[in-house]
Regions:
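Short hydrophobic alpha-helices and adjacent helix-cap/hinge residues
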Residues: 1-123
Length: 123
């Protein structure tokens, strides 16, 4: 149980970082709720987890990710050998924040952070 595992971090963790693990994603709201109770900030790897309860995420823009993926698929569909299509690294990262979730987790986001971030609460 993800919520129970989150509660076991009480006094043992200053922050929780989540990736796109299937167990965490399927129970994200329960984990975020437990983190709120404990005032442990949740930092995620994707925008949608911020919408679901994380304080912030520094991740790739899904549109850009899809565009790069589409370019790779296009090359394969045009008879380029899969073995010659090199993996791509996404270097342009976007900061997503939720002041609402930050407050619930005991975090104050500075004006400087808010200035440079996409506030998912505004969307």
């Amino acid at each position: 149980d993800v919520a129970m595992a989150t509660r076991s971090l009480d006094g043992r963790a200053d922050v929780i970082y989540t990736s796109l693990d299937n167990n965490v994603v399927s129970a994200f709201e329960a984990m975020a709720s437990a983190a709120n109770e404990l005032k442990i900030p949740v930092i995620a790897s994707d925008e949608f987890s911020v919408r679901r309860g994380a304080t912030a995420a520094l991740g790739v823009n899904d549109y850009d990710f899809g565009r790069v993926t589409g370019e790779m698929v296009y090359r394969v569909l045009n008879d380029e050998a899969v073995a010659t299509v090199k993996p791509q690294v996404m270097n342009d990262l976007t900061l997503y924040v939720s002041p609402k979730h930050a407050q619930a987790q005991g975090v104050t986001l500075s004006d400087e952070v808010l200035k440079d971030a996409i506030n998912v609460d505004d969307q």
